[in-house]
C-alpha cells in the first residue's frame, strides 16, 4: 500500500499555506470571510491572480488531499483514468467501507460484502496501486477517522 502522510507536521505546513492565501484574499476583498470562504479561498492555486467575482469566477483550487469511498470512488477513479495521468498529483486514498450493509453481524456482513462487491474492490485496489493512491480494505473499521485526529485549523 502507498504511504499517505497524515501527521501534525504535514497539517501544520498546509495551515501555513492556507493562512498565507487567506491573507492575500482578505487584502484583496476587504471584507470579513465566511467559513465557506475560508475553506475554499484558502485552497486557491494563485490567490494573487485569481478572479474573485461571486457568481462569475471559476476558482483554480489546490486541494490538500482527495478521499474516495467505494461507492462514488469508482466513477471518480474512472474519470481520473480518462486524464491519462500516470499518478495522482495530491495525496489520494480510497476507503472501502460504504458497500458493507448491516444485515446480521459484523463478520457475516463483511464476508457478504466481500463476495457481492468483489469486482468493485478488485478494481479500486488495482487502480490505487497503479496510480499511487492509498487503499483501505473493506473492514478496516472507520477508515476515515484519521482525518480528524490532526490539530484543528483556526482561521482568525
Question: In which residue ranges do the predicted regions lie?
Answer:
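Short, contiguous pre-domain boundary segments
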Residues: 2-7, 22
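Long, structured ligand/cofactor-binding scaffold of large enzymes
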Residues: 11-13, 18, 22-156
Amino acid at each position: 500500500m502507498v504511504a499517505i502522510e497524515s501527521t501534525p507536521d504535514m497539517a501544520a505546513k498546509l495551515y501555513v499555506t492556507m493562512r498565507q492565501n487567506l491573507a492575500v484574499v482578505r487584502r484583496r476583498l476587504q471584507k470579513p470571510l465566511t467559513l465557506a470562504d475560508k475553506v475554499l479561498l484558502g485552497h486557491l492555486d494563485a490567490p494573487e491572480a485569481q478572479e474573485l467575482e461571486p457568481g462569475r469566477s471559476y476558482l483554480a483550487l489546490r486541494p490538500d488531499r482527495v478521499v474516495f469511498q467505494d461507492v462514488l470512488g469508482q466513477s471518480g477513479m474512472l474519470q481520473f483514468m480518462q486524464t491519462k495521468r500516470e499518478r495522482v498529483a495530491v495525496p489520494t486514498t480510497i476507503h472501502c467501507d460504504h458497500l458493507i450493509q448491516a444485515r446480521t453481524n459484523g463478520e457475516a456482513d463483511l464476508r457478504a460484502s466481500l463476495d457481492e462487491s468483489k469486482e468493485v474492490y478488485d478494481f479500486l485496489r488495482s487502480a490505487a496501486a497503479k496510480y499511487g493512491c492509498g487503499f483501505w480494505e473493506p473492514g478496516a473499521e472507520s477508515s476515515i477517522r484519521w482525518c480528524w485526529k490532526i490539530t484543528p485549523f483556526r482561521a482568525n
